């Protein structure tokens, strides 16, 4: 699908369709008022007859409106004008895309980007419209033999901006939006892929392909089990012992900052391509969704793709910690004591608390990069789902400025996170009689004790942890990966690169 921006009055648009907003109760947006005036009150007359109230989600498609060059006008209900916020704006865009796609409008000029969204500028509205449009049109049908497609799918969308001065920011918004949307799609595709296809080797192949595509400043190294043994990554290795698929850690290095002393930002993604729970096996119901336990790695991959596509002036390293947790004769057991790469020992009380065992060795491994910051992304705890539900990602950090940056980026991107405390009192729950720590700390504050466990391996750098157990995928009828938190991390890196959308 093609996107562009232009600046022009609605009556001069010659297109298959013009899209404008209507507020409650039957109140035309400024652009709709212009069209109504040119059409001698045609639109307002329809509203007076009760054709459209302007409630959110309502639509009315008009054909051959008098004195209008475009074939059709699509009126979209936007709710009450004063209540139009970021979330509702994106819902309006989503409804617009679905309606255009369903009605065979192959191209359209959209004036919804001129609606007032409190605290958000033209760049934000155009970029969010692009991201929302791509999200709305996403489908995962690679493995289906019969693929359903619209007879006349939407192919071109033009976003109108109020003045020519805003064309540059609009074009940049499209560029950024497309790169982020492509990263989200890549993450969703990886997450939705079945575990008999998407194993650690598959993740490694995708990482290598990324380096091939962006060979100018991306290199990928894949570390296998033999090298992990030499490095002392015994906790990581233990988790994969029960699987016939080799554990592989893919390290994607992007260099965009020419300064020799520029330190990298490191992103670490938990990549459990299937988590049966191991010896502490999970219930059968819903176990199919444990293919999504690699969504952290999928998100990191998507972000690295965005960074490479936009050629951001940063150094960024993405680590995909690929592994599979299965029961078997070689599987690790409750009661085992593991010596991690850091030298600290861990008593295994539950083999289904495996993500932190993989991550702790990776968090030690990345010390060698002398990072400016490290952010790990993991579907880590069901406790985070209980705490924050399926709408907000859990955030923990040992560095207040980094946490504030991530929260700000999450708000701007519409990919929200909420900070949970890493209070010392929770560390006591990880005490073990037989090792330096246990791998679980009981039910109370389970998301926080998992973060406390990881914090013991991150003392040499600024670190943040994103628990995406509740936000990485949806269940039920809309089942599928969400691609979160690609948007959050993309905004964080755009901010670091100086593109904060305040132009």
Curated annotation (Swiss-Prot):
Its cofactor is Mn(2+). The active site is at residues 282, 356. Its EC number is 3.4.11.1, 3.4.11.10. GO terms for cellular component: cytoplasm. Its main location: cytoplasm. It comes from the Bacteria. This is Probable cytosol aminopeptidase. The gene is pepA.
């Amino acid at each position: 699908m093609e996107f562009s921006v232009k600046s022009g009055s609605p009556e001069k648009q010659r297109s298959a369709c013009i899209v404008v907003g209507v507020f409650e109760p039957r109140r035309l947006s400024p652009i709709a008022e212009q069209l109504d005036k040119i059409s001698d009150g045609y639109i307002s007359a329809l509203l007076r007859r009760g054709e459209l109230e302007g409630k959110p989600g309502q639509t009315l498609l008009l054909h051959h409106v008098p004195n209008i060059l475009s074939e059709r006008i699509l009126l979209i209900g936007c709710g009450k004008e004063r209540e139009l916020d970021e979330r509702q704006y994106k819902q309006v865009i989503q409804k617009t895309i679905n309606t255009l796609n369903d009605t065979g409008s192959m191209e359209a000029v959209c004036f919804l980007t001129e609606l007032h969204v409190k605290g958000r500028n033209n760049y934000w509205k155009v970029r969010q419209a692009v991201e929302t449009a791509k999200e709305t049109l996403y489908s995962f049908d690679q493995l289906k033999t019969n693929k359903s497609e619209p007879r006349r799918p939407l192919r071109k969308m033009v976003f109108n901006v109020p003045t020519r001065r805003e064309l540059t920011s609009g074009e940049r918004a499209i560029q950024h939006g497309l790169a982020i949307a492509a990263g989200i799609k890549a993450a969703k595709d990886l997450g939705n892929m079945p575990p008999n296809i998407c194993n650690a080797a598959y993740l490694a192949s995708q990482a290598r392909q990324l380096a091939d595509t962006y060979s100018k400043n991306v290199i990928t190294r894949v570390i296998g089990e033999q090298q992990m043994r030499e490095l002392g990554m015994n906790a990581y290795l233990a988790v994969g012992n029960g699987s016939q698929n080799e554990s592989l850690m893919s390290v994607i290095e992007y260099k965009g900052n020419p300064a020799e002393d520029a330190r990298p930002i490191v992103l670490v993604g938990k990549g459990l391509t299937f988590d049966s729970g191991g010896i502490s096996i999970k219930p059968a119901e819903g176990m199919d969704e444990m293919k999504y336990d690699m969504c952290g790695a999928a998100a990191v991959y998507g972000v690295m793709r965005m960074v490479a596509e936009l050629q951001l002036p940063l150094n960024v390293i993405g680590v995909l910690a690929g592994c599979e947790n299965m029961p078997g004769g070689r599987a690790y057991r409750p009661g085992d004591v593991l010596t991690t790469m850091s030298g600290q020992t861990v008593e295994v009380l539950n083999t289904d608390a495996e993500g932190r065992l993989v991550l702790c060795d990776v968090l030690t491994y990345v010390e060698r990069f002398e990072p400016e910051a490290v952010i790990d992304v993991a579907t880590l705890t069901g406790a985070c789902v209980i705490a924050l539900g399926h709408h907000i990602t859990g955030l923990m950090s040992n560095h207040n400025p980094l946490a504030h940056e991530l929260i700000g980026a999450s708000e701007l991107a519409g990919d929200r996170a909420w900070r949970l405390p890493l209070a010392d009192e929770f560390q006591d729950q990880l005490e073990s009689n037989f090792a330096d720590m246990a791998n679980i700390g009981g039910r109370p504050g389970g998301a926080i004790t998992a973060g406390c466990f990881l914090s013991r391996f991150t003392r040499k750098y600024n670190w943040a942890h994103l628990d995406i157990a509740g936000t990485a995928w949806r269940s039920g009828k809309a089942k599928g990966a969400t691609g979160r938190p690609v948007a959050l991390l993309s905004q964080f890196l755009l901010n670091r690169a100086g593109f904060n959308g305040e132009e």
